[in-house]
Amino acid sequence: MKKNTDSEMDQRLGYKFLVPDPKAGVFYRPLHFQYVSYSNFILHRLHEILTVKRPLLSFKNNTERIMIEISNVKVTPPDYSPIIASIKGKSYDALATFTVNIFKEVMTKEGISITKISSYEGKDSHLIKIPLLIGYGNKNPLDTAKYLVPNVIGGVFINKQSVEKVGINLVEKITTWPKFRVVKPNSFTFSFSSVSPPNVLPTRYRHYKISLDISQLEASNISSTKTFITVNIVLLSQYLSRVSLEFIRRSLSYDMPPEVVYLVNAIIDSAKRITESITDFNIDTYINDLVEAEHIKQKSQLTINEFKYEMLHNFLPHMNYTPDQLKGFYMISLLRKFLYCIYHTSRYPDRDSMVCHRILTYGKYFETLAHDELENYIGNIRNDIMNNHKNRGTYAVNIHVLTTPGLNHAFSSLLSGKFKKSDGSYRTHPHYSWMQNISIPRSVGFYPDQVKISKMFSVRKYHPSQYLYFCSSDVPERGPQVGLVSQLSVLSSITNILTSEYLDLEKKICEYIRSYYKDDISYFETGFPITIENALVASLNPNMICDFVTDFRRRKRMGFFGNLEVGITLVRDHMNEIRINIGAGRLVRPFLVVDNGELMMDVCQELESRLDDMTFSDIQKEFPHVIEMVDIEQFTFSNVCESVQKFRMMSKDERKQYDLCDFPAEFRDGYVASSLVGINHNSGPRAILGCAQAKQAISCLSSDIRNKIDNGIHLMYPERPIVISKALETSKIAANCFGQHVTIALMSYKGINQEDGIIIKKQFIQRGGLDIVTAKKHQVEIPLENFNNKERDRSNAYSKLESNGLVRLNAFLESGDAMARNISSRTLEDDFARDNQISFDVSEKYTDMYKSRVERVQVELTDKVKVRVLTMKERRPILGDKFTTRTSQKGTVAYIADETELPYDENGITPDVIINSTSIFSRKTISMLIEVILTAAYSAKPYNNNGENRPVCFPSSNETSIDTYMQFAKQCYEHSNPQLTDDELSDKVFCEKILYDPETDKPYASKVFFGPIYYLRLRHLTQDKATVRCRGKKTKLIRQANEGRKRGGGIKFGEMERDCLIAHGAANTITEVLKDSEEDYQDVYICENCGDIAAQIKGINTCLRCSKLNLSPLLTKIDTTHVSKVFLTQMNARGVKVKLDFERRPPSFYKQLDKVDLKPSFLK
């Protein structure tokens, strides 16, 4: 089918972003931002954090100081590849070493004398072990010369015992916009955080809160716990900015609605009343008095001048090197937002908006942990020096303190799912889907306690700020993660920046701003504040804001600043601010540029002819004004057209209102949603369910399973899908396969395939259709003495063990077989016994229902014997296994039919799978039919006009009409078989065939939808879930089957199971199982007076309630279930009286029966 290049130019530009871009160092786009994030940490940021020189202790007015210096930081990559690490069963770590020097500085008249106290040159091979991120092709950032494995995308850490770990990205708690909160009616707070720039180490955090109560405007204060004074916000702004109150009034009132101006006047008047209430008021004296009061309150050891300098110098750490006057103007701009937000809350970004948040990526996790653990390490050294000086009178450090930085434990906890001790961020990759290597590292989630603290459920809704940057389909639809985890769209990524790049970029932007006329950037009274990462640098003339932003964006796209991901946001709506963002953790994605009402893509004439030979970075260099990288904040405050088609339908005046234009709808999906087909042609819930099922599909090998002992389920004969999307192809999901093509028929089969039941052909299974292999890890720890003990009596459980006590290779394990010898022995205290040694088997048994072959055995000998066994099992589809299409048509095997039982077409072809046809109508999955039609059309013409094999592009979300796809299928059949009549062609296009009854060999009355489709096998396997048993262990409390397959558990028999048996008329079975079972049977004595259950005291049944009242109760014995007795006892213990009352009936008397004469009639 010939492409309309003009209408698909936006689609082709979007595809250029998805494909690799070697010129820009991008070899795998989906996880590139994670690779860069981790690379920045281990190559640069780790050195910056660990390289320290600072005082530990100071004495004698700072003339004597104990100093610490950490230097010579070296990071060494491992000597082996990730595959070797898996074979050895070890982790894949880099080694970091450093040198610590502790010395004493004494200031003398001759200068500074230095005395060495202690030093340690870290050459220990286990000083700091940093889990190394495996990137695309098994590469790592420290050794890029490793061999390339094209289908290994990486993005994982190999933890100890060769377990792969993958983590999500967490939303940072600190917000870049202040948080507005209504405390109570007419009482509000405005909280914001200030964090020092990345070049300031250790990082300083300050959290401030501005409070405002309409009834007490004099108490409109700013405060911070133990780090700042509580002071009126207006007076603090006046103190810092050195302007009059009238200046502040005019600045707050400029371009504000009348209601806000009224509140501004009231706040300024309240500040005036404070100044007028103090005789000879002086702002400096006022602030100094508050600082002195705070100094006394905190009982600080510092002098008053040192205390004041620390408090005011460290005020607003993100503006650390900024003059106090700019800090004052910054506070005025915050107060403007606060007052405006009181009346117009809906126009201000709320705390759940992604505009306010940055994202923590892999590198940021390790950076945060390294920073925290280094501070703990230095704190331990300081405490040890103080203790030694106190106890011994010498400045010394124990070598144990110097050699235990604590980073190893922190990193190990991180990969075990703990970030900052309490917050879960990482989870083990379960190995059942290759796709999860992409989906998990590209997911963004909130802190688990973030929602609990805020006590808000709006965070669980699809927030408007997530539009275009997050996939609206791939979201959890049930469970605790609903609304808390979102998947990035295929065009979205997260920014990263080095400290040196940050400083250079900040310098270039400041130089550009200061290149403007001085008076135009000094409009601090009525201008638009310009901030760089929330730090105020200038205030722009309001008449120049549009020209400034337009020129800044053009220069950014042309590479003037050396960074194409700078975000510039023009905030209007009376808040009046220009925000420039350059930091890491911002969500960015490309957009098509609209300049002065023209789509720049249409203006560039040469772009269309040269596009095929260009990469995305080439387009950015040679056609810089076509595409712009836009962060989520800039997008939120910009006018963005939904699509190119809608933009071209607008008038010229309407076009001038827009700044950007979006790409087609398929680029708004994530990579998991891109594996689906035509979700916009289906009902809405099918997209969400389809994403969940696609992640549960069994795919091909994610790594060499024979060389690593880990769990996994893998497809044995995978096939590349024919109907794909561009994102599915560029992400290598298509090449790494997650299903097979099968022939399906939509029809009813003898009433067996009702609801979700499917019929599957027996010969299809025998030929390896959707066959899988299960790799399972079994791990046991055995005391060394138990492992060395010999068994006295031959046990059947040890029949698969060799003489060394380990299971044999290639042995087939069955349920009950031991995997290693574990014999516990005990000595009897009996002098007359001939043999006072007894032994018994305590080994862990193989518990799976199916036999498995032993593939590998690993043993580690320490104080215990650690045995790890890898078993393999081929598992063909059986009854109860689950399958699905890519349109969320999930089915369960209801019957395995022989080929002779299935209907066939004129060529003798029988369907591999029969699906109930009513499922299409009930679930409204039209795209499933389109997929079958397109796959069948491909089989008719698998090559394009140039003789090249070409898959069919059917994106997950597309704006193409169904008629277009029908026309494409029609052309394929006409090309391969031009002699077809119209009816035959229609049957071919719509996959309608006449099938024949296998019993009568007569054709069915109606045609059947019959064709190929890509089918997925899910990880929900019957034999993994079967826990039904007749006998076994029961819990002590409720006497129901215990839980867990490993503990031999079963399924509880409750009300729903009872209803099922009632439906089948099994009343006697219910009585036997629920009531008459020996284990559940319970004799209970009931008091007929009060209805209590009698207690048994010294073998005598008595009613406690009646005995205390000196009554003589009548106890009646009844038989009931143990569960009923436990329920009544538990309710009584909670203060709920459940009275068992007996049915009172009046006695019934029957009249005497009439006598019946049985004599023969002839004798009467």
From Swiss-Prot:
Statement: the UniProt record of this protein carries the keyword Nucleotidyltransferase: yes
EC number: 2.7.7.6
Main location: virion
Compartments, record wording: Virion
InterPro entries: DNA-dir_RNA_pol_su2 (IPR015712), DNA-dir_RNAP_su2_dom (IPR007120), DNA-dir_RNAP_su2_hyb_sf (IPR037033), RNA_pol_132_poxvirus (IPR024390), RNA_pol_bsu_CS (IPR007121), RNA_pol_Rpb2_3 (IPR007645), RNA_pol_Rpb2_5 (IPR007647), RNA_pol_Rpb2_7 (IPR007641)
Pfam families listed in its UniProt record: RNA_pol_Rpb2_3, RNA_pol_Rpb2_5, RNA_pol_Rpb2_6, RNA_pol_Rpb2_7, rpo132
Signal listed as a keyword: no
Top-rank lineage group of the source organism: Viruses
GO biological process: DNA-templated transcription
Record key words, sorted: DNA-directed RNA polymerase, Metal-binding, Nucleotidyltransferase, Transcription, Transferase, Virion
A single cellular component GO annotation: virion component
Membrane-crossing residue ranges in chain numbering: none
Disulfide feature: none
Catalytic reactions of this protein: RNA(n) + a ribonucleoside 5'-triphosphate = RNA(n+1) + diphosphate
GO molecular function, one term: ribonucleoside binding
Assembly behavior: The DNA-dependent RNA polymerase used for intermediate and late genes expression consists of eight subunits (147) kDa, (133) kDa, (35) kDa, (30) kDa, (22) kDa, (19) kDa, (18) kDa and (7) kDa totalling more than 500 kDa in mass. The same holoenzyme, with the addition of the transcription-specificity factor RAP94, is used for early gene expression.
Family: Belongs to the RNA polymerase beta chain family.
Functional note: Part of the DNA-dependent RNA polymerase which catalyzes the transcription of viral DNA into RNA using the four ribonucleoside triphosphates as substrates. Responsible for the transcription of early, intermediate and late genes. DNA-dependent RNA polymerase associates with the early transcription factor (ETF), itself composed of D6 and A7, thereby allowing the early genes transcription. Late transcription, and probably also intermediate transcription, require newly synthesized RNA polymerase.
The protein, known as: DNA-directed RNA polymerase 132 kDa polypeptide
Organism: Ectromelia virus (strain Moscow)
Gene name linked to the record: RPO132
